[in-house]
Amino acid sequence: MSALGAVIALLLWGQLFAVDSGNDVTDIADDGCPKPPEIANGYVEHLVRYQCKKYYRLRTEGDGVYTLNNEKQWTNKAVGDKLPECEAVCGKPKNPANPVQRILGGHLDAKGSFPWQAKMVSRHNLTTGATLINEQWLLTTAKNLFLNHSENATAKDIAPTLTLYVGKNQLVEIEKVVLYPNYSQVDIGLIKLKDKVPVNERVMPICLPSKDYAEVGRVGYVSGWGRNANFKFTDHLKYVMLPVADQYQCVKHYEGSTVPEKKTPKSPVGQQPILNEHTFCAGMSKYQEDTCYGDAGSAFAVHDLEEDTWYAAGILSFDKSCGVAEYGVYVKATSIQDWVQKTIAEN
């Protein structure tokens, strides 16, 4: 079991460990703990229940309850002597975001509203975003990873040049970077940390969805460390509430798509985004609020009211709209879900 998700064993009758051998109860631990009274035509069964620390949950087929058998082994009815594991809770921020906040020159993130938001600093001190998806892995864009690197750079070249912060400026070490196989069309990369991060109210992964939340009109929240209304990088995490836009209108607005993304005078911002079946667009809010340079890599976070859980519907790829163009562009989480799971399992 991971030290970060260490279980707490709660024992019936304090620290008593005993086994019923016919009519005799044999102590195997704490002599200072009294035996429970015996009853006629019955016997004492001693149990242990595993529970997880706050912000973790049991990952097991059983119920976490183990009994001591005649061989002095603790076993669970469902999983035998296999011990349960504690995994990090995802998508349950302590202080969920409130409506109508903004990234471009607006209100600050409340403590713990976006605990999955990470700040990544690339070579030459450029700030970008990344999104924590479990205790040891983050999603960001391939373009973020390649900032100030040549197109011939490898993942091994890139990893040592990055600096990453989670929570309240908690520096974490990067073990490796993994790029999506076709990252020129699907602008995504994964970052693996050297160690798992302890999960708490300031550091918590967002959940990846099993269904597509990028429906036209659905509202999501995007947090970020990118440039503000004065085009200066902010020292404080900010966020904005944006609606998913009609894809056809988005493509029409940018007059098409380029793969990979490139500069063009046709675009309202002088640069053409990647637009395909793996992307969706989000428009500006009714207050003309928007994302901007440096926000890429952040999640388009949606709140599933029925589950009371926050999911990453997508990852911001094109962050150059900055209130000038009408749409930001995001990579769909459902398009990369299988690759993410496979990559994490293999690494």
Curated annotation (Swiss-Prot):
It is found in: Secreted. GO terms for biological process: acute-phase response; defense response to bacterium; immune system process. Residues 1-18 form the signal peptide. It comes from the Eukaryota. GO terms for cellular component: blood microparticle. InterPro entries: Haptoglobin, Peptidase_S1_PA, Peptidase_S1_PA_chymotrypsin, Peptidase_S1A, Sushi/SCR/CCP_sf, Sushi_SCR_CCP_dom, Trypsin_dom. The keyword Metal-binding does not apply. Disulfide bonds join C52-C86, C90-C207, C250-C281, C292-C322. GO terms for molecular function: antioxidant activity; hemoglobin binding. Residues 103-345 form the Peptidase S1 domain. Its main location: secreted. As a result of hemolysis, hemoglobin is found to accumulate in the kidney and is secreted in the urine. Haptoglobin captures, and combines with free plasma hemoglobin to allow hepatic recycling of heme iron and to prevent kidney damage. Haptoglobin also acts as an antioxidant, has antibacterial activity and plays a role in modulating many aspects of the acute phase response. Hemoglobin/haptoglobin complexes are rapidly cleared by the macrophage CD163 scavenger receptor expressed on the surface of liver Kupfer cells through an endocytic lysosomal degradation pathway. The beta chain mediates most of the interactions with both subunits of hemoglobin, while the alpha chain forms the homodimeric interface. Belongs to the peptidase S1 family. Tetramer of two alpha and two beta chains; disulfide-linked. The hemoglobin/haptoglobin complex is composed of a haptoglobin dimer bound to two hemoglobin alpha-beta dimers. Interacts with CD163. Interacts with ERGIC3. This is Haptoglobin.
